[in-house]
Amino acid sequence: MQFSISRENLLKPLQQVCGVLSNRPNIPVLNNVLLQIEDYRLTITGTDLEVELSSQTQLSSSSENGTFTIPAKKFLDICRTLSDDSEITVTFEQDRALVQSGRSRFTLATQPAEEYPNLTDWQSEVDFELPQNTLRRLIEATQFSMANQDARYFLNGMKFETEGNLLRTVATDGHRLAVCTISLEQELQNHSVILPRKGVLELVRLLETNDEPARLQIGTNNLRVHLKNTVFTSKLIDGRFPDYRRVLPRNATKIVEGNWEMLKQAFARASILSNERARSVRLSLKENQLKITASNTEHEEAEEIVDVNYNGEELEVGFNVTYILDVLNALKCNQVRMCLTDAFSSCLIENCEDSSCEYVIMPMRL
């Protein structure tokens, strides 16, 4: 069995697929990628048993259809180091793969293709399409609030929720919450799942910034996304996500509105002298003025005064400045609204002109 392919056609899909592989898999065959040759098309598949990625590309020639495995990292390193215009020929004989290009020749050990695991076929409960850039924006707007290696395993991921014609992503680590909602062109049944953190990071890496379609299939145990030449599949977290609606403050009495760029720069400067561990800053509000102060264990201090629209009572409250900057970097807008109730309440932050994304940050003790 033999096929030929240009380096240009092979490198990108191979890199994408190798990205989902584990560095130390429990099963030796998972060090490999699966190669499926059919009608001059090559499908490359990789998995770590949690996330699976398949990517298709065009062959220059093939002697017959077939399915084989090849060591992923070694094959990728060989392809990466060949010259840009290289033509690569791969020949499979028994338990060996011969990779040739010009005067270069490599013999690699393979594993039986039938031993390669795959996430079995499953029935999707929700199936719809949306532009890739829309899905990417949904994920990027909320992913920074995901927990990382939290004992509450259901927080180590992102909630995907369909409700009528709405698609929503939600992420929280217990200290902050991010919710982003978009409208779809079709009505869907109400359904929600939790995509693991690794699945979220791999998926957003695949999504383009154009309006090419992405087809989402959401099942009970898996989520699958079909892109142009790529199919992404991830297992889901079996757990109950917190009721985020109870966290969103709806009766805030103290409303602050200010310029996004000015606030972002002020918080960024104040953060330089904030405590390295706590990362706390003090927000002091009075009529049409926000004062941001920070200090650290070396008794160094920073103070920033920003003009804002505020007509409530004077108020002092503390927040983690990293959390605030994460929100501001995600918003990228003209005017920002901050909604508070008192010095002990959470703060809701949103774009003044677009409430599709909402962010909640818990206060810190001053």
Swiss-Prot record:
Keywords for this protein: Cytoplasm, DNA replication, DNA-binding, DNA-directed DNA polymerase, Nucleotidyltransferase, Transferase
A GO BP annotation: DNA strand elongation involved in DNA replication
GO molecular function, one term: DNA binding
InterPro entries with a match to the protein in the record: DNA_clamp_sf (IPR046938), DNA_polIII_beta (IPR001001), DNA_polIII_beta_C (IPR022635), DNA_polIII_beta_cen (IPR022637), DNA_polIII_beta_N (IPR022634)
DNA-binding found in the keyword field: yes
Principal localisation: cytoplasm
Compartments in which it is found: Cytoplasm
Family listed: Belongs to the beta sliding clamp family.
Subunit structure: Forms a ring-shaped head-to-tail homodimer around DNA which binds and tethers DNA polymerases and other proteins to the DNA. The DNA replisome complex has a single clamp-loading complex (3 tau and 1 each of delta, delta', psi and chi subunits) which binds 3 Pol III cores (1 core on the leading strand and 2 on the lagging strand) each with a beta sliding clamp dimer. Additional proteins in the replisome are other copies of gamma, psi and chi, Ssb, DNA helicase and RNA primase.
Protein name stated in the entry: Beta sliding clamp
Lineage, highest ranks first: Bacteria, Pseudomonadati, Pseudomonadota, Gammaproteobacteria, Pasteurellales
